[in-house]
Swiss-Prot record:
The modification N-acetylmethionine is found at residue 1. This is Protein dpy-30 homolog. It is found in: Nucleus; Golgi apparatus, trans-Golgi network. The gene is Dpy30. There is a cross-link at residue 35 (Glycyl lysine isopeptide (Lys-Gly) (interchain with G-Cter in SUMO2)). Its main location: nucleus. Residues 1-26 are annotated as: Disordered. As part of the MLL1/MLL complex, involved in the methylation of histone H3 at 'Lys-4', particularly trimethylation. Histone H3 'Lys-4' methylation represents a specific tag for epigenetic transcriptional activation. May play some role in histone H3 acetylation. In embryonic stem cells, may play a crucial role in retinoic acid-induced differentiation along the neural lineage, regulating gene induction and H3 'Lys-4' methylation at key developmental loci. May also play an indirect or direct role in endosomal transport.
Amino acid sequence: MESEQMLEGQTQVAENPHSEYGLTDSVERIVENEKINAEKSSKQKVDLQSLPTRAYLDQTVVPILLQGLAVLAKERPPNPTEFLASYLLKNKAQFEDRN
């Protein structure tokens, strides 16, 4: 029985070519997904450069600017430029994934 379990264990290890480095199947999947996302991201950056000005702005800064301006209009701070700059810096992570 133990020899069967050892054989099963060895079979599982043999299925994962990177097991000798301690990489599990889930880690390998994560790495592959990251590679694919990086390739898509680099293709997207090239696409952004080829867009007309209006389309480029609509896809990059208009969404966060509209949200920031809406908050600015609602709160009406005494220093609106600094408020908007601060808002953009604080919330840019929410919108960077969309680009």
